[in-house]
Amino acid sequence: MSWQQSLTDDRARQIRELVSAASAADGVAPVGDQVLRALAHDRTRHLVAVEDDGAGSRVRGYLNLAPADDDAPPMAEVVVHPDARRRGTGSAMIRAALAEGGPQTRVWAHGNLVAARATAEALGLTAVRELLQMQRPLADLPPQTTAQRVRFATYSGPHDDAEVLRVNNAAFSWHPEQGGWTDADIAERRGEPWFDPAGFFLAFDEDTGALLGFHWTKVHSESLGEVYVVGVDPAAQGRGLGAALTLLGLHHLESRLTGDGRVADVMLYVEADNTAAVKTYRRLGFDIVNTDVAYAAVAPTDV
């Protein structure tokens, strides 16, 4: 195993293939999208475990370590090839991440699978954060709602970014990943193959022209869409914008993905301790289908 600050194109390709193999075997992606985006950059550390099979080296394990950022601790995500498991590779990589990032480092277990729970217990790690994946069919949606003195539009280009950033960073000031965005965060996502301005909805105050909230949708496949981000300016809370924007995006995804008798679902992620949001999404017909858990050697109250 070795730490690397940047990856060659070939190494990044091998890691993507590793992630695909693990996803197929486990039924859940072992790392988040932000890790895949980070493969082309040097903003995180890359721990790579390779095996020489005589025909060349193959990546058998990979860990991404994102450094601490303001109040957010270091974040680690790890994946081991299905054919290379039960050899201690994952445990060794996690130990290396804890040594590199410190005891407050969070190690994500996507899906919190049995093997991940056993590894966490063996390493003496404690669950410190839970992220719920909720899902519902894109059928029989609740009717769309409106909000008074609000104009809805779709994203029209980078000149909208300043207002999107203002609302996003106000709405998610508490969030370790979603808060503190810059122009680069939007530009990077705008360059992703899935980006579609027609699925990026904005709500403006009719009187002042200020952005009040937004709903960014994402299409993963012909059968799965996502409520990617819903953000409402805290100063505009209480006007029904969250529900109106969410339903606007859901109906857009239904129209895009369920034509010609096709069947599709929509999913989202929400913090488990955000009970108000969880209740809201349950009222909209979402159910919990998966849980991602962050483990750490030190509980938050001890940091």
Swiss-Prot record:
The keyword Repeat applies. Keywords: Acyltransferase, Repeat, Transferase. It comes from the Bacteria. GO terms for molecular function: mycothiol synthase activity; protein-N-terminal-alanine acetyltransferase activity. The keyword Repeat applies. 1D-myo-inositol 2-(L-cysteinylamino)-2-deoxy-alpha-D-glucopyranoside binds at D33, E177, K218, E226, Y269. GO terms for biological process: mycothiol biosynthetic process. PANTHER family: L-AMINO ACID N-ACETYLTRANSFERASE, MYCOTHIOL ACETYLTRANSFERASE. This is Mycothiol acetyltransferase. The lineage of its organism: Bacteria, Bacillati, Actinomycetota, Actinomycetes, Mycobacteriales.
